[in-house]
C-alpha cells in the first residue's frame, strides 16, 4: 500500500520552519535537533524519542564528520517517507533512497560541503576548540547554515509533493 504524505497547505510553512530552526539553534544548540524539531512542530509530529535519537548527531556526529544539516534532512525524509517496520524489507527502503541522495547533493551545493569540519574549521572532538567556536562570531555562520538548510529541505519536500513523489510504503499495521 502506498500512502501519500501531505505537507501543510499554506505557503508560509517553509519560512516558519527556517526561522524556527534558526531560533532553536541560537537558543538551544544542536544543528540536527534544531532543524528536526522545527519540522516536527510544523508537521504536527510529537514524539520526544525522535528528538532524543538525534541527541549525538550535532557537530558532525560529535566528531566533525557529516554536517548536522544533512543528517537532519535525512531524518526528516525518514520521518515522512521511511519504512514503519523492518519487516517491510527493501520495499520499505526504496521510496526514501533516491530522494535522500538528491537532497544530500542539494544541501552540499547550498552549504558548500557536507563536512562539518570543512564548514566550521573545528575539530569538535577537541573540547577547547569546540568551546572557542561556540563563543566566537564564527558560530553565526552555523546559525545561517541551519536556517538555509531547513529552508532547502522544505523546498525539496514541496517539490517532491508537487512531482507526486512524496509517499511511503505502508506496513501491514499502517493505517
Question: How should each PLM-predicted stretch be described?
Answer:
Residues 19-26, 56-65, 134-138:
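A short glycine/serine-rich beta->alpha loop
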Residues 6-11, 38-55, 122-127:
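Acidic-glycine-rich active-site phosphate/pyrophosphate-binding loop
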Residues 16-27, 36-42, 130-134:
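Active-site flanking loop/helix segments enriched in acidic
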Residues 72-80:
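DPxDG-like acidic metal-binding loop motif
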Amino acid at each position: 500500500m502506498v500512502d501519500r504524505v501531505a505537507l501543510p497547505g499554506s505557503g508560509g510553512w517553509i519560512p516558519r520552519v527556517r526561522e524556527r530552526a534558526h531560533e532553536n539553534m541560537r537558543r538551544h544548540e544542536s544543528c540536527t535537533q534544531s532543524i528536526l524539531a522545527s519540522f516536527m512542530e510544523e508537521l504536527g509530529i510529537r514524539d520526544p524519542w525522535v528528538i532524543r535519537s538525534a541527541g549525538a548527531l550535532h557537530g558532525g556526529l560529535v566528531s566533525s564528520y557529516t554536517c548536522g544539516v544533512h543528517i537532519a534532512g535525512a531524518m526528516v525524509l525518514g520521518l515522512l517517507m521511511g519504512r514503519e517496520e523492518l519487516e517491510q524489507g527493501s520495499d520499505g527502503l526504496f521510496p526514501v533512497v533516491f530522494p535522500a541522495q538528491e537532497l544530500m547533493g542539494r544541501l552540499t551545493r547550498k552549504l558548500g560541503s557536507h563536512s562539518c569540519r570543512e564548514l566550521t574549521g573545528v575539530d569538535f572532538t577537541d573540547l577547547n576548540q569546540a568551546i572557542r567556536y561556540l563563543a566566537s562570531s564564527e558560530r553565526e555562520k552555523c546559525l545561517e547554515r541551519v536556517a538555509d538548510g531547513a529552508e532547502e529541505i522544505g523546498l525539496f519536500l514541496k517539490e517532491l509533493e508537487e512531482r507526486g513523489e512524496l509517499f511511503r510504503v505502508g506496513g501491514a499495521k499502517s493505517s
